[in-house]
């Protein structure tokens, strides 16, 4: 049994177009805000109530950053899996501040577009920062043969060219 688990799963809507920045060595980092909502009926008044939570999501995975940059826009519905991390920083007056974020990096991250793209297709990416000096560094890309139900992007992926979708026919389950 594992000693501990740090996994966050969210389904929500993107509140604004994602912000993409680059590190000094050119690696992309995507920042986005995702809203999740819950609704209920007030027992006393019978009135419908809604509570919205805003979550900051940071994507370090290069393949997933490409998908975010190309296909994710304000209003998009996303399914994400990542890890919860709190970082400490100082504001302009020197006071310590803390930010809790959902971080997508490495092989344990997932980003799935649930409502497809504007053209009706979905994005799919192998993605992944495999480290070292191999040729796999940037990962997947968009697979135009993916289903119109939306795309799925896994953090741990496959080499750059991807695999053909017809390989699914050989899976025995």
Curated annotation (Swiss-Prot):
The UniProt entry annotates the motif Important for interaction with partner proteins at 168-173
**UniProt region (Disordered), positions on chain:** 114-173
- Reply yes or no: does the keyword DNA damage apply: yes
A cellular component term from Gene Ontology for this protein is: nucleoid
Cross-referenced SUPFAM superfamilies: Nucleic acid-binding proteins
One GO BP: DNA repair
**Gene3D superfamilies hit by this protein:** Nucleic acid-binding proteins
Q: Which residues form the SSB domain?
A: 5-111
Q: Report the superkingdom from the record.
A: Bacteria
Is this entry keyworded DNA-binding? yes
Q: Where is the composition biased (Gly residues)?
A: 119-142
| Keywords (A to Z) from UniProt | DNA damage, DNA recombination, DNA repair, DNA replication, DNA-binding
Q: Name one GO molecular function term.
A: single-stranded DNA binding
Describe, as the record does, how this protein assembles with itself and its partners: Homotetramer.
Identify the PANTHER family for this entry: SINGLE-STRANDED DNA-BINDING PROTEIN
Main function: Plays an important role in DNA replication, recombination and repair. Binds to ssDNA and to an array of partner proteins to recruit them to their sites of action during DNA metabolism.
- Please state what the protein is called: Single-stranded DNA-binding protein
Q: Which organism is it from?
A: Agrobacterium fabrum (strain C58 / ATCC 33970)
Q: Which taxonomic lineage is given here?
A: Bacteria, Pseudomonadati, Pseudomonadota, Alphaproteobacteria, Hyphomicrobiales
